[in-house]
């Protein structure tokens, strides 16, 4: 600041003196209103100091309030960020627990389904075996019936050819005697 004032006074001192036309330095204090200017500047300085002081104080208060508000917002944002980080970590832990539980549940379901499939397979095999056995027995019984029927037909044909009247009476008596013995035994 002092350099600026020194430069200004140097420029003013080098200006030509006198009453020439144009711009020149007038050394007469009364003509230049230097006293009036000094009084106005002094009055401005005296009355403007309180105004400037109040203005600067208000500005300082506003700046300090803005800084405090910014600090409070920073603290709130930091707290919210920390809370969000904590919630995120908690969510990650819960997600990991859910994943682990779902893996366990999937394994349990897999084992259960494998057991059910095994049981169903065993039951189907047993049913197949029972069906095969039933069909085999049915086929065997059918074959037996056919064999017996054919044997009886052949026996009847042979007996018709071989039996005469006398032989038939003898067989009939023998059968009646056997039946009589059976009836006597059962009594």
Curated annotation (Swiss-Prot):
It is a single-pass membrane protein. Keywords: ATP synthesis, CF(0), Chloroplast, Hydrogen ion transport, Ion transport, Membrane, Plastid, Thylakoid, Transmembrane, Transmembrane helix, Transport. It is found in: Plastid, Chloroplast thylakoid membrane. GO terms for molecular function: proton-transporting ATP synthase activity, rotational mechanism. The keyword Transmembrane helix applies. InterPro entries: ATP_synth_b/b'su_bac/chlpt. The chain crosses the membrane at residues 34-56. The keyword Chloroplast applies. Pfam families: ATP-synt_B. GO terms for cellular component: chloroplast thylakoid membrane; proton-transporting ATP synthase complex. In plastids the F-type ATPase is also known as CF(1)CF(0). F-type ATPases have 2 components, F(1) - the catalytic core - and F(0) - the membrane proton channel. F(1) has five subunits: alpha(3), beta(3), gamma(1), delta(1), epsilon(1). F(0) has four main subunits: a(1), b(1), b'(1) and c(10-14). The alpha and beta chains form an alternating ring which encloses part of the gamma chain. F(1) is attached to F(0) by a central stalk formed by the gamma and epsilon chains, while a peripheral stalk is formed by the delta, b and b' chains. F(1)F(0) ATP synthase produces ATP from ADP in the presence of a proton or sodium gradient. F-type ATPases consist of two structural domains, F(1) containing the extramembraneous catalytic core and F(0) containing the membrane proton channel, linked together by a central stalk and a peripheral stalk. During catalysis, ATP synthesis in the catalytic domain of F(1) is coupled via a rotary mechanism of the central stalk subunits to proton translocation. Component of the F(0) channel, it forms part of the peripheral stalk, linking F(1) to F(0). This is ATP synthase subunit b, chloroplastic.
